């Protein structure tokens, strides 16, 4: 059975970097995906699912929830490792509920933990505005992204806390101790 870990956190929390470093350090045992990468890879594959995804993306439309979840589940089942990390998902209560429903209807993938990389809004803002990645990293866009992240957050955290799947990592430190703590946490959860 595949063991899935979801890594969530504010923009600038370091969740993508953390997940990426963990998977790189143990590539024979851990695979890291981001939802955007999975959708782009499916389009590039030329599959029927990829053509469906492309028909939305090419028009600038959001890919429907069922298509996104189908893409994620197919990738998880086909992953080359037993342990899989996805960062930045779920982003909404609707995504969370639908994903939970789909996972409960199959027996190949087990959600083991939802790890929140917790940072203050000040730290997140400092990191995002300091990284100069492009036009999307301005203050107005940052606050909009924070709003999108924080609006459903309490409901998402409550849901996973009730299932005893929510774990917190302090993201306001240097990357090395964060990654070390996250690796340790994943090992600990897997041994339960």
Curated annotation (Swiss-Prot):
* A GO cellular component entry from the record: cytoplasm
Keywords linked to the UniProt accession: ATP-binding, Cytoplasm, Kinase, Nucleotide biosynthesis, Nucleotide-binding, Transferase
Compartments, as annotated in UniProt: Cytoplasm
Q: Which reaction does it catalyse?
A: AMP + ATP = 2 ADP
Task: Provide the residue span(s) of the region labelled LID.
Answer: 130-136
The family annotation for this protein states: Belongs to the adenylate kinase family.
Q: What is this protein called?
A: Adenylate kinase
Underlying gene:
adk
């Amino acid at each position: 059975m595949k063991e899935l870990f979801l890594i969530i956190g504010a923009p600038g929390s370091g969740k993508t970097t953390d997940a990426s470093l963990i998977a790189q350090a143990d590539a024979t045992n851990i695979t890291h995906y981001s939802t955007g990468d999975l959708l782009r890879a499916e389009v590039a594959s030329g599959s029927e699912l990829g053509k469906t995804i492309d028909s939305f993306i090419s028009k600038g439309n959001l890919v429907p929830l069922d298509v996104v979840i189908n893409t994620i589940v197919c990738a998880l089942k086909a992953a080359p490792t037993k342990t899989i990390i996805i960062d930045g998902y779920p982003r909404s209560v609707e995504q969370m509920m639908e994903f939970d429903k789909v996972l409960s209807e199959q027996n190949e993938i087990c959600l083991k933990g939802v790890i929140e990389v917790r940072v203050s809004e000040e730290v997140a803002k400092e990191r995002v505005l300091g990284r100069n990645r492009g036009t999307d990293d301005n203050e107005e866009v940052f606050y909009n992204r924070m709003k999108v992240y924080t609006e459903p957050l309490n409901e998402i955290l409550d849901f996973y806390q009730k299932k005893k799947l929510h774990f917190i990592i302090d993201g306001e430190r240097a990357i090395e101790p964060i990654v070390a703590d996250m690796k340790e946490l994943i090992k600990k959860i897997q041994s339960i």
